[in-house]
Regions:
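Perimembrane helix-loop-helix junctions
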Residues: 1-11, 185-218, 222-223, 227-228, ...
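Short helix- or helix-capping micro-motifs
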Residues: 25-26, 121-129, 133, 153, ...
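Loop-to-helix entry region of an early transmembrane alpha helix in multi-pass inner-membrane enzymes
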Residues: 66, 70-74, 83-100, 134, ...
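Transmembrane-helix motifs of polytopic, lipid-linked glycan transferases
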Residues: 92-112, 150, 317-321
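Membrane-lumen/periplasm interface segments of specific transmembrane helices
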Residues: 207-319
Length: 444
């Protein structure tokens, strides 16, 4: 009871702006969604409802839901039947999930930085075209993303208790019921614990506390998939590979079409060189293009400055340099130059500058980050590690929509907000000091 009273007092003293932003977002999206967007604009919404009906009828073995388990169809058909309107049900799911993400974005960022940075980050979420789009449309994308964000709130807490680890596994599993991508967040978190948790006993204890609730919660889906389809996952990456790989030959495409229901290893061994060429193109150009907008003609982007190419990278990397508190040493400079030279030569020999320039952009930041890793807060460290692991895994396929990268997006507006609020004033101060110093020298 005392804890509840303390929580109420804390809420009263808390800044009301995050709640106000969330409420404004809710009513704007509600108005657009229910008064202007009055038909299924995407086939996915009605597809998941119909798929849910077929599952309830016992016809699941005849369904082909590539890239998604049965949770999405069951959610849509259950709420749709309850309300008597599949369209309204889908709208409610999207609206509540999108509003929840905007609300949580503040509190997750507050786990990382101060309230001002968290508030600006929340504003980036509230005005994001992708968040608004997913909150209005009837799709199966934003509900699993909401549960990922709930898990991220507990993951980024500075002090975690046993219930926190249990809840992380549980909410990632709920997301897994709707989309498989949450397993990447789980893998990243387990790797983070094993690398950065100092006490060996805690490493395994915390990992098991997260892993077991996840496995226990997803076990009905795995069992259903195995009984119905003869495999644990209904994911079909080869389908996306056949449709999306940039570099293809006619013979290769025909072979891929023949193995769309098989695993990635089969696709890899058809032509390893062609597979790797596409993989590194996805990893260093196509997928990051949806994060930062490399070219003028790309409109499907998560860049916080979507009008101009590349510019969205500047505040992100500026925020990263701010948290690492970089003081470049001669050794770091030597390693950086050497790495840049080696990668440049490798790109000239094996790659193309047009598609692999991001390696050269990232190299200095990787060197500085690893050299100053102790200065980076652990929860920020996790989000950076998650970004790397997510991109490495997801780049097996070319993402066809920018919103597929939203599970890792929070760190980008958060670092940008940090740069705008704390980094720029530091730069201004240093410029003033430099001008004053030069003025003093001229006077003498």
């Amino acid at each position: 009871m005392l804890d509840l009273k303390t929580a109420v007092i804390q809420f009263k003293n808390e800044n009301k702006m995050p709640i106000l932003i969330t409420i404004v977002f809710f009513f704007i999206i509600f108005y657009v969604s229910f008064f202007h967007n009055l038909t299924f604009g995407e086939p996915s919404g009605i597809f998941y409802y119909i798929a849910g009906e077929e599952i309830l009828k016992g016809n699941a073995e005849n369904l082909g839901i590539a890239g998604a388990p049965i949770g999405g169809p069951l959610l849509h058909v259950t709420l749709g039947n309850l309300l008597g309107d599949a369209f309204t049900a889908g709208k409610i799911i999207s609206l509540i999930s999108g509003t929840g993400i905007v609300f949580l974005s503040y509190f997750i960022t507050k786990n990382l930085f101060d309230k001002k940075v968290a508030l600006l980050t929340q504003l980036f979420f509230a005005v994001s075209a992708k968040i608004a789009f997913l909150s209005i449309m009837v799709l199966n994308e934003i509900a699993p993303l909401f549960f990922i964000f709930v898990a991220l709130y507990f993951i980024t807490k500075k002090q975690k208790t046993i219930p926190d680890f249990l809840l992380i596994g549980f909410f990632l599993a709920i997301s897994f019921w709707l989309r498989y991508q949450s397993v990447i967040i789980l893998i990243a978190f387990l790797i983070f614990l094993l690398i950065f948790e100092r006490k060996t006993i805690l490493k395994f204890k915390q990992s098991l506390l997260t892993f077991f609730p996840f496995v226990l919660t997803i076990s009905p889906i795995l069992l259903f998939n195995f009984i119905t389809f003869g495999k644990l996952s209904t994911n079909a990456p080869n389908l996306y590979i056949a449709a999306g790989f940039k570099f293809q030959t006619e013979q290769w495409h025909e072979k891929i079409e023949g193995i769309v229901n098989e695993g990635l290893i089969s696709a890899f061994f058809i032509d390893p060189n062609l597979f790797l060429k596409n993989y590194f193109y996805n990893l260093f150009f196509h997928n990051p293009d949806h994060l930062f907008k490399f070219t003028v003609d790309v409109f499907d982007t998560l860049s916080i400055i979507p009008v101009f190419p590349i510019l969205g990278m500047i505040p992100v990397f500026g925020g990263f340099l701010y948290i690492t508190k970089v003081r470049l040493t001669k050794l770091q400079f030597f390693i950086m130059i050497s790495a840049l030279l080696i990668f440049f030569l490798l790109i000239l020999v094996f790659g193309e500058i047009e598609y692999h320039f991001m390696i050269l952009v990232l190299t200095p930041f990787v060197v500085l980050g690893l050299s100053n890793i102790k200065k980076i807060p652990d929860n920020v460290k996790f989000l950076l590690l998650l970004t790397v692991i997510f991109m490495v895994v997801i780049s097996i396929i070319p993402v066809y929509r920018a919103y597929l990268l939203l599970p890792i997006w929070l760190i980008f507006p958060a670092l940008s907000s940090l740069f705008f609020i704390e980094g720029i004033p530091v730069i201004q101060t240093k410029i003033r000091q430099l001008i004053q110093r030069e003025g003093t020298k001229n006077e003498t």
